[in-house]
Structure formats: structure tokens, C-alpha cells
């Protein structure tokens, strides 16, 4: 009887430890969001065949930029990828495994997948542009796919951002 009680307690503790160690979205945000977005883009017939999933992922990766592009590179979804662990994504997706679990498996294969983080977005309505570094001002323009030809000083970048702000900033009323 005591042995049975100990087995139940150990089993409960093991389950508790497993759930507390489960990967959370914020621990591997680029992976989880990219896998979810990719899975949502697939139709039902494609989701059943892992080979079709791999083909669709390679096509999906061609349109990605920044962190998602790097994620694709790590998995082998790009032609220039050095390694390929695409089956670690495609097979679990064909089994309808959740994105968090897929990313947990991917992290075990390649830890740098979960090192990818989205950069914090700058709220242009509340930030004082004069207090930002030129690097951050350039990043704002780059994110907008805009350039600042002839900008040499910080004031030039601020002026260009102020000109473009109505076009790109979303202000809620």
C-alpha cells in the first residue's frame, strides 16, 4: 500500500515538473509565432502530408524577412541553409502538434532557434525622438522601407521621420 502511494506521489511530481518546464510562447517567440502563422496558411490536404508541408514551408520562407528569415535558415527552409532539420517541423505539423511543442522539439535539436527575439517596437506617439540614438532613428526609417538621402546629423533624421510620421504611425482616437 505504501509503495502504491509513493508511486502515485512520484508520478504526480513528475507530471508537475513536466508542465512547469514546458516551453512558453515568450521563451521562443519567433518560432512559435512563425510556426502558427505557417500552420494557419496550410489547407487541410497539405497538413496531412509532411512532404507537402516541407515544400510549402520552403515557399513560405521565400517571402520572409528579418527574424522569420533567420528562423527559416536555421530549419533548412532556404536554399542557402547549411543544415536541414525541416522534418522536425513537418512531421509534427502533420500530426497536428501545437506550435509550442514543435518549438520545444526544435530547441532540443538547435538551441539558437529560441534565441531569436523580436525587437521592441518604438511607440512614436510617446517617445521623444531627440532622445533616441541615430542608430534607432535609422532603424525606424529602415522598418518603413524609407531612406534619408543627404541625412548627416541627428536633426536631419528626426526631420525626415516627422515628415513621414503621418503616413506610418497609427494613432488611435
Curated annotation (Swiss-Prot):
Any Pfam family the entry gives: ARMET_N
SUPFAM superfamilies tied to this protein: SAP domain
Lineage: superkingdom: Eukaryota
Phenotypic effect of disruption: Total loss of dopaminergic neurites and drastic reduction in dopamine levels followed by degeneration of axonal bundles in the embryonic central nervous system and subsequent nonapoptotic cell death. Also exhibits cuticular defects.
Keyword Metal-binding attached: no
Disulfide bonds: 28-114, 31-103, 61-72, 148-151
GO biological process, one term: neuron cellular homeostasis
Tissue specificity annotation: In stage 12, expression is seen in the stomodeum and the salivary gland primordia, and weakly in the mesoderm. From stage 13 onward, expression is in Garland cells, the outer wall of the proventriculus and salivary glands. Punctuate expression is also in the ventral nerve cord (VNC), specifically in eagle (eg)-positive cell body glia. Epidermal expression is seen at stage 15.
GO cellular component: endomembrane system; endoplasmic reticulum; extracellular region; extracellular space; synapse
Family classification: Belongs to the ARMET family.
Role summary: Required during the maturation of the embryonic nervous system for maintenance of neuronal and cuticular connectivity. Essential for maintenance of dopaminergic neurons and dopamine levels.
Protein name (Swiss-Prot/TrEMBL): Mesencephalic astrocyte-derived neurotrophic factor homolog
Organism in which the protein naturally occurs: Drosophila melanogaster (Fruit fly)
Name of the gene: Manf
Amino acid at each position: 500500500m505504501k509503495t502504491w502511494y509513493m508511486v502515485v506521489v512520484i508520478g504526480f511530481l513528475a507530471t508537475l515538473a513536466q508542465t512547469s518546464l514546458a516551453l512558453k510562447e515568450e521563451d521562443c517567440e519567433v518560432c512559435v509565432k512563425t510556426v502558427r502563422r505557417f500552420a494557419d496558411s496550410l489547407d487541410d490536404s497539405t497538413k496531412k502530408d509532411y512532404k507537402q508541408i516541407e515544400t510549402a514551408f520552403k515557399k513560405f520562407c521565400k517571402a520572409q524577412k528579418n527574424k522569420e528569415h533567420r528562423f527559416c535558415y536555421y530549419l533548412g527552409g532556404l536554399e542557402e541553409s547549411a543544415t536541414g532539420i525541416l522534418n522536425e517541423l513537418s512531421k509534427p505539423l502533420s500530426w497536428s502538434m501545437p506550435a509550442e511543442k514543435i518549438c520545444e522539439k526544435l530547441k532540443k535539436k538547435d538551441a539558437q532557434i529560441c534565441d531569436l527575439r523580436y525587437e521592441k517596437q518604438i511607440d512614436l506617439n510617446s517617445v521623444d525622438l531627440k532622445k533616441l540614438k541615430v542608430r534607432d532613428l535609422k532603424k525606424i526609417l529602415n522598418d518603413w522601407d524609407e531612406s534619408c538621402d543627404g541625412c548627416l546629423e541627428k536633426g536631419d533624421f528626426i526631420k525626415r521621420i516627422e515628415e513621414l510620421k503621418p503616413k506610418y504611425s497609427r494613432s488611435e482616437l
